[in-house]
Amino acid sequence: MAKRKDNKTLAENRKARHDYFVDEAMEAGIALVGTEVKSIRNGRVNLKDCYADINNGEIFINNMHISPYEQGNIFNVDPLRKRKLLLHKSEIQRLIGIVQQQGVALIPLSLYLKNGRVKVNLGVCRGKKNYDKRDTMLEKAHKREMDRQLKERNRY
């Protein structure tokens, strides 16, 4: 029987792309407990306001809320606990060098399944100023208007 491809996006941090410039994105595994995986597969995860930080050469995700699994009575853990990211040592060293720069943060962009395992798309991000956000919204509005006019023009 052939392996099935299940690269299903489970959660996305849309606010991250609005609040930050994403310089680079990388895939990382995440250490979870069984009931957390079941809860994530049910879509009961929230990436809003979560971030990653580095402690003693290891990378952890903070403020990622995974709701307790309904049938997982004593095996449920704290919904906001720190969760370790699984990366190669060379990747961690490179990220340490990048994060030491001023104004750079590690932000989880999305959570997805890859071959039955939960993976995190981790972004190396720089914060946007308010005028950058306005410029982005203005560009989107102009593009939307141009597309609308092209559609009207090509309709007949």
UniProtKB/Swiss-Prot annotation:
The lineage of its organism: Bacteria, Bacillati, Bacillota, Clostridia, Eubacteriales. PROSITE patterns: SSRP. It holds the Pfam family SmpB. Disulfide bonds: none annotated. NCBIfam families: PRK05422.1 (NF003843), smpB (TIGR00086). SUPFAM superfamilies: Small protein B (SmpB) (SSF74982). Coiled coil: none annotated. Keywords: Cytoplasm, RNA-binding. Belongs to the SmpB family. GO terms for molecular function: RNA binding. GO terms for cellular component: cytosol. Required for rescue of stalled ribosomes mediated by trans-translation. Binds to transfer-messenger RNA (tmRNA), required for stable association of tmRNA with ribosomes. tmRNA and SmpB together mimic tRNA shape, replacing the anticodon stem-loop with SmpB. tmRNA is encoded by the ssrA gene; the 2 termini fold to resemble tRNA(Ala) and it encodes a 'tag peptide', a short internal open reading frame. During trans-translation Ala-aminoacylated tmRNA acts like a tRNA, entering the A-site of stalled ribosomes, displacing the stalled mRNA. It comes from Clostridium perfringens (strain 13 / Type A). The keyword RNA-binding applies. GO terms for biological process: trans-translation. It comes from the Bacteria. The keyword Cell wall biogenesis/degradation does not apply. It is found in: Cytoplasm. This is SsrA-binding protein. The gene is smpB.
